[in-house]
Amino acid sequence: MSIHRRRSLGVLTSSLTLFLMVLVATPSWAAEKTRLRVDDYQIEAELTPHLHQISVRAKVKFTALQDLTVAVFELHNDLRVTKVLDEKNQPLSAERVTQDSTVRVPLPAGLSKDATTTLTFEYEGQLDSADNSPVPGLKLAYIGDDTSFLFYAGRWFPVSGFGLNRFTSTISVTVPAHMLVIGSGKMSASEAAASKKPNASVLPTKTFTFVSTKPSFPGTIVAGIFQEYKSDEAGMDLHVFFKPTHQPLAPAYTTTAVQEFTYYITLYGLPPSQKLNVVELPGDTLPYAWAPEIAGLAGPSITEKTNYRLLADAIAHQWWGVSVSPASKDDWWLSDGFSRYSEAMYVESAAGAAGLEEAVKDMSVGALAYDTVPLSSASKLDIFSTEFQSLATDKGAMILHMLRWVLGEDKYNKTMREFATEFAGKSASMDDFKTIAEKNYGDQLTWFFSQWLDSTGAPEFKLKYTTYRLGGSAAKEPASKEERTPGFRVTGEISQDLDLFRMPVNLRIDTDGKTENKRIEVVGTTSPFSIETFGRPRRISIDPDHHVLTNSSDVKLRSAILRGQALQQQGDLSAALTEFNKALDLNKNSSLAHYRVAEIFFLQRNYQSSANAYREAINGDGEPRWTEVWSRIQLGKIFDITGQRERAVNEYRQATQTNDNTFGALEEARKYLQKAYERPKEKQ
């Protein structure tokens, strides 16, 4: 299982964002109610990497949830079913439906509700591209010489109830003897004779067997040539599998993984297993992947500066996804949102309040970018759509962030730990979580969950206030602290447009003396307040620590940019440009919006307009900082394309003078100082 984040050099955006952009135009998984529950898999797979081939024999034990006449499973469209047997080894017919990547097996005798049976599937195929992926455009299953990966989401074995149906498994994978295989569960390995199958390798092979006895979501397999780095620090059984080029970075990632793993133990208790495999994935698949005992990171994200945020999210899924899983699609945020906010909490522990603030800003943008469907109705959307991922991941995380503010630190931590413990190894619903939260809060929280789960939108706060000097003079020094009396009173009101809104909000009053904080209960469109201070008020701010999801002008701007990037990745450049211009309507000086506009014009080969927009980015508000160095580089490319080498060199030099190496900018600039940029030739 996998889903979500960080930087991608090509578009200079977060990997989660990139992932969400790619996952579009997908079929509606689970649109048809699941009628069976898979209990166990017995899978034997043989990989022939040099031919990109896989052959599989899979025994699927399942239970009917209602009377069945046809058993339906999802299976990758590049896999051809050659045989299906019932539990008496009698052959059955199978219908392949490519539109929804399913295989339908009629059951001649039927299967009554609660009855259990086993089907055996034999199938084979070539997995060498994303052309027929269950998620169009995204490679989720691939067989190759350097690295092979078979994600659970790739449906490389017959799947039912994706992400909801917990199961046990025994998976044996045969590969060339020089390869390692990483999977979930207790592992054993044995040498095997060369395969006698046509086209199979005559070289020695090795079979790796993984036994998972705890129902969860095993089924993700990674095979390839890796350097292994081991650690038993803090009682962990940690294995880091990196490619030789990244092996020098393994110790740093090992240390970080141990820190994150142990941090989560202090928050949530023990995970299902103390074993963790951190695995390098190819750069043309997910930014990261997770499965029981597995945290996979795409090669480009493994940098000298440890990508601790991405790793933290992947590791958090050992609790939220592997241990506690969603009971329905509407509850998906209990996995992805919980992991996202766990990452944010680790960032806070490692980088302080400033780190958390940046994470919250990112989550706020994602939470409101596609806020057209309530999170409690997310099942109306496709699991792999941009909208679904935005809601489940970022809005789900923001709900936890706000709940932490409502409950207070101790009660919040108690709620999360109890939820993780009570539902360990089980599926859970939002109501299950709400029950535990209300118990610790000491009152009902219907108003909170109804507001953020069952509704859309967020407030935009406005503040009006008047300051009065009181009778006591603040200028005079009192004889003692006890004699001090307030010198000023601030009265005013907080307003916003949501009639049913209710949330506690912090008011911060900066004065000549001590800063005052006042927790105000904002209810309805207008909420009055009165606060007395000792020093003269100089500045009043609403929710300065970003405890509440708000639709501020900055969030609106960044949300428009996020939507534009998604459209750009889909190839709809005109619609993307419209979104970027919406961002500029909110802030004409936004360097990021100008940069994105410039990218569109560059892709359209409208080089003059692109150059103009890159210069606007350089002269804008400078947020984020990397827009300057990359605008310089892009201007250099434009001058190279148009035959103005001297001007191009000048831009590359100015790029190096920024000393900003975000996303490897300095290496990029130095490369084109040595050799002029050439526009890639179009594919025929």
Where are these regions (language model features)?
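N-terminal, polar/Ser/Thr-rich
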Residues: 24-55, 63, 82, 139-143, ...
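Amphipathic alpha-helical substructures
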Residues: 66, 272, 382, 389-486, ...
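A surface-exposed beta-strand-loop module
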Residues: 78-139, 195-203, 207, 524-536
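Beta-strand-rich binding/interaction modules
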Residues: 81-85, 182, 445-446, 459-542
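Extended, low-hydrophobicity, Ser/Thr/Pro/Gly-biased non-transmembrane segments
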Residues: 122-226
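Juxtacatalytic substrate-recognition/specificity segment
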Residues: 142-143, 171, 209, 226-332, ...
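Acidic/His/Gly-enriched intrinsically disordered linker/tail segments
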Residues: 213, 287, 330-332, 336-402, ...
